[in-house]
């Protein structure tokens, strides 16, 4: 061993040369050295670990580590038997190969340094590879975050934008359709109403389909919860039309119930007023047939009489509804009747003292409807003798009477079959509309309406030039239309009929008067005078023949 050590420590010049030669030899020496005591150095050139090989290196190191250790231990046991044998082999090696021995020691040191560097390089490569993997994972997560935290693709976003554009377009179209619907209300235009309604329904269906499309888009990219929400939404969408139909049916049921109550009231009034008038009804029906056959030819007194009967029926119906509203509002009906009688007496020119002496209990409670009907008829027939009910100063009937009569009869034929509510919806400010507004405001004053309905909403609409679509106002329009048609017929006839009204306290004349109260034997007892007039009468003259429509009066015993 000592000669080998001495031979290895030569002069510096030779030592530097040896280092260079050793560096060259290291590049050509084999890679794997089994143990440091080996004599020959037969190895492959050293290799640097690549990043792609690190994974294979780690996997092999785990699986084959134990096997390699066992193999090397067996080889060591075979090669080295004892410590003395080892010393002899090393000494022989130094004597036989003095230069290679020094090179071997240097190579061993170099190899240890190289192994250390290689391990460090491998560790650095592993660290760099792990950093690269982390960076790649971070980039993937960033890309996923940019694409959408919920996994929304670019195509889905574009489709969402298209859906939103369609939603805004549908909303704008629905707004235009709603404006058209409002314009069709005032003035009332059924065709425009139908078109606007169809447009509104179409746009609503379009928005509903867009909503379902949006829900399907959300359901495809989400979990079961959104699918369940979409299912519930589709169920609500399917049930919604049926719920709307049920609501409409409920409204119709309420309307029908109200109509039934009104018809019951009409039947009650008709049965009380016409208890034994079966024969009279047959005569009226025959008159109605005759009038309908002659309506398109020319105005005749029979047509006027038939229209007057319609006025009586309409006034009874409206009076019954108004009286029921008063009772529902807990009015003092007796006080209201006294107030009506006082107003009737003052219009007839009676003094308050003379009226007060006879007004006590003159009208029983069951006859209060006659006093209320008297009040209504007096208000609505006021100004009947003028061609426009004194709403303006027109004198067309005097300037061109023949043309005016033809125009009035043409208006009568046009208006007879029309619904007054629809007519006023189309032409709210026509002459008939102005007549309805004026008469309603004179019959139903503000305090009365507030007491009956709790507010004055209908009155405010009428003052503004509109016409409410309520049941009460509809009943009033029925009476107003009947009086307006009677007025048109009156100015269509030549000569025009003259109307008259019985004064309070006047004696009863069966030729000109008709009692609203039915007596037991069908005849009016002696000593009855007019308590107050209920409805005016008319005197007709046509082609030398005259007829009279009797005035309806409420009779009381002479005081």
Swiss-Prot record:
<feature type="region of interest" description="Disordered">
    <location>
        <begin position="107"/>
        <end position="127"/>
    </location>
</feature>
<dbReference type="InterPro" id="IPR006943">
    <property type="entry name" value="DUF641_pln"/>
</dbReference>
<comment type="function">
    <text>Required for red (R) and far red (FR) light-induced and phytochrome-mediated deregulation of negative gravitropism leading to randomization of hypocotyl growth orientation.</text>
</comment>
<dbReference type="Pfam" id="PF24994">
    <property type="entry name" value="GIL1_IRKI_C"/>
</dbReference>
<dbReference type="GO" id="GO:0009639">
    <property type="term" value="P:response to red or far red light"/>
</dbReference>
<protein>
    <recommendedName>
        <fullName>Protein GRAVITROPIC IN THE LIGHT 1</fullName>
    </recommendedName>
</protein>
<dbReference type="GO" id="GO:0009959">
    <property type="term" value="P:negative gravitropism"/>
</dbReference>
<dbReference type="InterPro" id="IPR056813">
    <property type="entry name" value="GIL1_IRKI_C"/>
</dbReference>
<dbReference type="InterPro" id="IPR040225">
    <property type="entry name" value="GIL1-like"/>
</dbReference>
<dbReference type="Pfam" id="PF04859">
    <property type="entry name" value="DUF641"/>
</dbReference>
<feature type="compositionally biased region" description="Acidic residues">
    <location>
        <begin position="114"/>
        <end position="127"/>
    </location>
</feature>
